[in-house]
Amino acid sequence: MSEILPYSEDKMGRFGADPEGSDLSFSCRLQDTNSFFAGNQAKRPPKLGQIGRAKRVVIEDDRIDDVLKGMGEKPPSGV
């Protein structure tokens, strides 16, 4: 197994025409790329019973009962 050595300033490379000029420091870290490459593959498609079903919605309107009762009593006009 390979040995991991501590990172030091001596190991950093210098860039530009003048190596003694301004320093450009950077660090490179490995990140978990599984989620990047997986994309939508990790998300499963919905089951047949779940298609078209909305999540529970809470309606906070005091007039909703009157509106719902009024819709059942009146036939649609102009249709």
Swiss-Prot record:
- Provide the residue span(s) of the region labelled Inhibitory domain: 43-69
Cysteine pairings via disulfide bonds: none
Where is it localised?
Nucleus; Cytoplasm, Cytosol; Synapse
Family assignment from sequence similarity: Belongs to the CAMK2N family.
Classification via Pfam families: CaM-KIIN (PF15170)
Give me the ranges of the annotated region Disordered.
1-21
Q: Origin organism of this chain?
A: Homo sapiens (Human)
Give the organism's phylogenetic lineage.
Answer: Eukaryota, Metazoa, Chordata, Craniata, Vertebrata
What is the annotated tissue distribution of the protein whose record heads this document?
Highly Expressed in keyhole limpet hemocyanin-stimulated dendritic cell (DC) and weakly expressed in unstimulated mature and immature DC. Highly expressed in kidney and liver. Moderately expressed in heart, skeletal muscle, and placenta. Weakly expressed in the small intestine.
This protein's GO cellular component annotations are: cytosol; nucleus; synapse
The UniProt function text for this chain reads: Potent and specific cellular inhibitor of CaM-kinase II (CAMK2). Traps Ca(2+)/calmodulin on CAMK2.
Identify the keywords attached in UniProt to this record, alphabetized: Cytoplasm, Nucleus, Protein kinase inhibitor, Synapse
> Where primarily located?
nucleus
Any single GO molecular-function term of the entry would be: calcium-dependent protein kinase inhibitor activity
- Reply yes or no: does the keyword Nucleus apply: yes
Q: How does it assemble?
A: Interacts with CAMK2A and CAMK2B in the presence of Ca(2+)/calmodulin or after autophosphorylation.
| Protein name (database record) | Calcium/calmodulin-dependent protein kinase II inhibitor 2
- Entry keyword annotation includes Nucleus: yes
Instruction: Give the top-rank taxon of the lineage listed in the UniProt record for this protein.
Output: Eukaryota
